[in-house]
Amino acid sequence: MNQPVFVLNTNAKRENQKEAQQGIFLAVKSVASIIKTCLGPKAMLKMILDPMGTTVVTNDGNAILREIDVTHPAAKSMIELSRAQDENVGDGTTSVVILAAEVLASSELFIEKKIHPHYIIKAFRMALDDSLSIVDQYSVAIDLKNRPEVLKVVQSCIGTKFIGKWGSLMCNLALDAVMTVHIQEEDGRSEIDIKRYAKVEKIPGGDISDCRVIRGVMLNKDVTHPKMKRMIKNPRIVLLDCSLEYKKGESDTMVDITNEDDFSALLKIEEEYVQRICEDIIKLKPDLVFTEKGVSDLAQHFFVKKGITCLRRLKKSENNRIARISGATIVSRTDELQESDIGTGCGLFEIRKIGDEYFTFLEDCKEPKACTILLRGASKDILNEVERNLTDALNVARNIVLDPRLVPGGGAIEMALSQALSEKSKSIEGLHQLPYKALAQSLECIPKILAQNCGANTVKLLTELRAKHATNPTENYTYGVDGDNGTIVDMKQLGIWDTHSVKVQTLKTAIESACTMLRVDHIASAASKQ
């Protein structure tokens, strides 16, 4: 009579509450243990063999986690956490995973004691709100017009990276690029689109010291005809996203030719069409024509006769950047071209040969709101690592320009938060007190790992640092761990700072993700379809 009802597929793997929670704790700790040694100036490098067989050597937390293959959903969630942090603020990818794992581990004891996750989560959320207000209280404003000071901050943020030797050069490149693409709106809003308008071009060869910011656009393109000019000063630029060749039908077109005259007429129509679109361009007397589509031999012939240089098959993003630096408007139909569509903001167009390839340079722009960062290096591996570190420097510079506030680095702000929250936990009553205090203690993981990674005596160092912060919290909040030699130093004197936006985002992301994990009480893995 009573047949059993199977709600889930019988092949699906299921974990009940206790198994699921234990699995999550273990998975999260495992991910954090992989990148724990990648924190601080004495960070170790990881060598990873990716699925394509390429070896990646890096200490960038996000780059490492992106390459490793994990099966547990909680571990995947931690990797996603690092990626989200990287996309949002571009820094603190290692710290956020370590902190999330530590916060989650601090709740394990309460789960074992059968305290409901609801109480733990509420305590964590209270601690997060208090942490954010304390970080605001301890933040210091920075003057963006003081370039040496801004450079020092950017350098302190990427000093842990592989390219520490060329840190000064990378910071200058990053700051120049960010200031170039920075747009201040009339209503006070700022826009810095690094991804779209600060293009990184990597060319193997030369030395890292040859890297520079081109206040304009650089393309891996050559002119379409050997007789075209290869250098033009103050060029008049036309940008097109239409083809400069005869337009063929969208579908298969059949033409019935009965005699020779019909064929000649067909060729003549093609020639007249190409000539007409070329005349639309020529009448505006441009020096340079860029198009996203093809250019026919006949069109090249007309351009060469009039001394016009033409480049074809540009990417949409490249065309947008040229429009941004030159003031030109991208036009879809040649018969709609007007004088106002011509770009005159570029000072120099030149084709240069680097190695075996030809590159187009558009430089000396009046008001470039886009730039190209040219990276040189001995090998592709070095170039890839330099690019990863430059991306971090660009993100730090962008964060400072958008939110010019700093907090002390070297684990100082985490220790100050830990001290302040521990004190505040004494005034909290009920079941919330213990998880609140546990979160406060878990924040000490950052100075602890910094000390471990440089080979210092962790127990002694942390005890001294705790005592320093406890004696005078309002003045000693800038004391942290010097990651180079494992001593307690005033970060203000050492000039080690973190950006306010990164620190706030790290705390929010780490604690919120820990709260999300705590709410999981069941894991059901569906059977894969064979």
UniProtKB/Swiss-Prot annotation:
Localization terms from the record: Cytoplasm
GO CC terms in record: chaperonin-containing T-complex; cytoskeleton; phagocytic vesicle
Family annotation (Pfam families): Cpn60_TCP1 (PF00118)
Major localization class: cytoplasm
Keyword Chaperone: yes
Keywords annotated in UniProt: ATP-binding, Chaperone, Cytoplasm, Nucleotide-binding
The keyword S-adenosyl-L-methionine is assigned to this record: no
GO molecular function annotations of the record: ATP binding; ATP hydrolysis activity; ATP-dependent protein folding chaperone; unfolded protein binding
Protein family according to the UniProt entry: Belongs to the TCP-1 chaperonin family.
Name of the protein this chain belongs to: T-complex protein 1 subunit gamma
Organism: Dictyostelium discoideum
Lineage of the organism: Eukaryota, Amoebozoa, Evosea, Eumycetozoa, Dictyostelia
